[in-house]
């Protein structure tokens, strides 16, 4: 009798966990949160911005070009989502400051930062990379996420904490031939995530990392632009398809939600089964 009662309690508890994890008991897990997403007018960034807004957040999108910002905002607002936007070149201090100020002015604070902006200005041997290319790659891909995080921390502290997600790449674990400085910069983000997580945990700010594999975007176009090349890439994946931007979005929303409140300093790989160990 006692065992039967215990089994009943366990079954009900498991059912509650299952329902919660499937979203059956709670809607809008990011309700009233304010999210900044850099490089979010196309590809992975756009999919993340859309998902955060669908899950209840007020989202501020950004990009280097006003035309792209306007188009993304119009599309997402047309879907009934709470989205605004501003131009932001993450390598420029004044643009980073404006992005933060825009969110605070419109929504009263910041709860979430998704640092997605990146460049890959070079293809070839590491021995042929110029100092100029190194500076540009590390400035945008590594230094800017660190400084962007620094800029939002005071606003997150005012709201009792927050969540940062830094977008790295499968190239951090398995370097892509020819993408030499890009590979190095994306590996550096794994260390940045760990370091920020340790430093910001006492402030109730969690920092995690997303490492997408081969996702079908304009950024990765040269890897899949013809059918033969695409089929060849699929053969290297355990899940025999290329990823879509939406494959990354739900994971980021989860990491920004209370469901991930005990997760920090971690990297989640969305790579179709691509080996991902340093």
Curated annotation (Swiss-Prot):
Chemical reaction(s) catalysed: a secondary alcohol + NADP(+) = a ketone + NADPH + H(+); 3beta-hydroxy-5beta-pregnane-20-one + NADP(+) = 5beta-pregnan-3,20-dione + NADPH + H(+); 5beta-dihydrotestosterone + NADPH + H(+) = 5beta-androstane-3beta,17beta-diol + NADP(+); 5beta-androstane-3,17-dione + NADPH + H(+) = 3beta-hydroxy-5beta-androstane-17-one + NADP(+)
Cellular compartments annotated: Peroxisome
Entry EC no(s): 1.1.1.184
Binding site for NADP(+): 36-60, 186
Residues the record marks as active site: 182
Residue positions, PTM N6-acetyllysine: 92, 105, 216
Listed GO CC annotations: peroxisomal membrane
Site description Responsible for the stereoselective reduction of 3-ketosteroids into 3beta-hydroxysteroids and benzil into R-benzoin, residues in chain: 176, 179
Residue window of motif Peroxisomal targeting signal: 276-278
Subunit structure: Homotetramer.
Domains: entry comment: The C-terminus peroxisomal targeting signal tripeptide is important for peroxisomal import. Once in the peroxisome, it is involved in intersubunit interactions.
Protein name listed in UniProt: Dehydrogenase/reductase SDR family member 4
Taxonomic source organism: Pongo abelii
């Amino acid at each position: 009798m006692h065992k039967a009662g215990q089994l009943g309690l366990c079954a009900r508890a498991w059912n509650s966990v299952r329902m919660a994890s499937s979203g059956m008991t709670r809607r809008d897990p990011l309700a009233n949160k304010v999210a900044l997403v850099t490089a979010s007018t196309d590809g992975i960034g756009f999919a993340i911005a859309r998902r955060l807004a669908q899950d209840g957040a007020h989202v501020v999108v950004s990009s280097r070009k006003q035309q792209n910002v306007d188009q993304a905002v119009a599309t997402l607002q047309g879907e009934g989502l709470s989205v605004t936007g501003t131009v932001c070149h993450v390598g420029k201090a004044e643009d980073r400051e404006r992005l933060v100020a825009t969110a605070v002015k419109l929504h009263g604070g910041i709860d979430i930062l998704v640092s997605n902006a990146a460049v890959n200005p070079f293809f070839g041997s590491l021995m042929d990379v110029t100092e100029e290319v190194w500076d540009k790659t590390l400035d945008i891909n590594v230094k800017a996420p660190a400084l962007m995080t620094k800029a939002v921390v005071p606003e997150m502290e005012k709201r009792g904490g927050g969540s940062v997600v830094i977008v790295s790449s499968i190239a951090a674990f398995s370097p892509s031939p020819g993408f030499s400085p890009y590979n190095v910069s994306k590996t550096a983000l794994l260390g940045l995530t760990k370091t920020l997580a340790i430093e910001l945990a006492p402030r109730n700010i969690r920092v995690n990392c997303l490492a997408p594999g081969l996702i079908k975007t304009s950024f990765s176009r040269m890897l899949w632009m013809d059918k033969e090349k695409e089929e060849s890439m699929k053969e290297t994946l355990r899940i025999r398809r290329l990823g879509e931007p939406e494959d990354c979005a739900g994971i980021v929303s989860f990491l920004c939600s209370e469901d991930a409140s005990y997760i920090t300093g971690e990297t989640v790989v969305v790579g179709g089964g691509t080996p991902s160990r340093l």
